[in-house]
């Protein structure tokens, strides 16, 4: 069949384009006004029996008719069975070219919840210790089902239940002996137990880890993330306002997750040297273990334990330091100071702050959303200034072989690049790594004003929780700032303890090169004692 001409037609969705930019409060106000004006509506009923999420290819087209035109393309369709899993099908939909699945308000969370529910139902089982298996199996067979059902109902209703009769005690004894395992469910307590076992197995196999690294990519700042979020095909380093950036990021959580995955994989390959032809920044990597955690505003950051090939254990390092091996002490200090530090590169915090043309007006901690900035000092410099958190790192120019004696263009270009490197790293540290103690606050819940709806109130009478601060009721910082400062790196030859040079009390230790590459907050800690390793391991999987 040949088609000589084609006709275009418009498909009208449930809501028009003019409604997509309105807030939920404004939409409710519009709907109420429509009803008051005797406007018509479409009633959509539902069956008494809910739709099943198993073997039901039409459940997603029914829930999201605007995403599945004409009812085609549902998840779990017969022609894709045993070819593409439901999880992979959802991933492919989320990568659809026009990003309609990514930006839908409900599809990503509904699809993820279904995966979690199925994993919890089909991937769970009961686990018991082998030496108690015979005893527990007999106890299970002798349980009174009516008593067990009654306890379940009372617990479900929120009642605080205490075992009083022997039959009730037998039911509670089974709960103590059995461990409900859902290891396939991401984020479950059992998955955390698996993580703990994996970490300690790695420590048993590779020895003690040498470094603990935290990465916090700024999705609402980084141009790569904004490119993933936006619909444009051409990448550009366009600087946007904070409102525009935050609006884009909030509309597309999938793009933010893609950006985080890209940054982490780039870090592991290029900085750690994994599956690469060069050693890592900290040495030859023999292993790593990382976990992902969400922050208060639902963005992601990474905690990573790093093992270095040939690294000495904390006890071996301590023994060498106590033995007063001066050569080893000097080499160790030189290595530690070369890969992490706790102060600015070009001067004190005050001098760096004075040299930056733009300053952040208000922030709520190192992980908070950055606000608009105001110019200070030199107006001309402020006009040319670009916030480094919104730009990409500049590649280093080729290095001249005779750098110390040569004065060629390549050498001058290299010198200018290093000067820019130092100032950029300090600017990034000032914006991303300086801790500012704040108190928790509450504020009236403010609602966006709809110009077409005069009845909409600007401010709600309710009070919502404001940004959570780090100061407790005694005024003590929960993050343990300010920290102790030290003018130089010293070694206590009595107990082998190394005290690193640290000039900034409100800054964690970091790696300058890593800060420059990530253009965001990073923390790097040397694990030089067994106590610190145990504390970090517990922190990672809790």
Show the residue positions of the predicted features.
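Intrinsic low-complexity, intrinsically disordered terminal tails and linker regions enriched
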Residues: 1-302, 306-542
